[in-house]
Design a protein with these regions (language model features):
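An N-terminal assembly and electron-transfer interface module characteristic of large anaerobic redox
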Residues: 1-155
Length: 155
């Protein structure tokens, strides 16, 4: 991860100007089931998508659905940040999108099940408010899929 002190001044100032509000000490919702019963989805800000889904652009607040059965070889990355080193993703997609690992957790009964669809956003360039509409859409889709919890991989 790049340190703020390593960035050019203009970029450091841009990031510091975002000044997001703290999330606070409490969780958004209390878990009512043991982890071994949870249906879990993946959400990433790595800007990944299937080859046929279309690339993300820098100011893109949309999302791309990724099926739980998607093969890693058919997932590509169009994350636009020049500060993001993609070599880990190229080596192993599980670095940014642990699809194989979550299936292993389900097979070993550590979690209840894997959601039918996971979601990817492009996490660079926009204020959080820009994602409000698509976040509400994805939340509705997760509810339809009976998802209990999400593993977020912020990139």
């Amino acid at each position: 991860m790049v340190k703020l002190t390593d960035l050019p001044e203009y970029e450091r100032e841009h990031l510091l100007s975002k000044n997001g509000s703290p999330l606070g000490p409490s969780v958004w919702t209390d878990r009512k089931k043991p982890v071994s019963d949870l249906r879990i989805a993946l959400i990433t800000t790595a800007g990944i998508h299937t080859r046929d889904a279309g690339a993300f652009n820098f100011t893109d607040a949309s999302y791309r659905p990724i099926s739980k059965d998607q093969k890693a070889k058919d997932i590509v990355m169009s994350h636009s940040s020049v500060n993001f080193d993609k070599s880990g993703f190229v080596e192993d997609i599980n670095v940014v999108f642990p699809l194989d690992r979550i299936h292993e957790l389900a097979q070993s009964k550590k979690i209840g099940s894997v959601a039918d669809v996971h979601y990817s956003f492009m996490g660079a360039g926009l204020e959080p408010e820009a994602f409000e509409q698509t976040a509400v859409q994805v939340a509705g889709l997760l509810k339809q899929d009976r998802v209990d919890a999400v593993l977020l991989t912020p990139v």
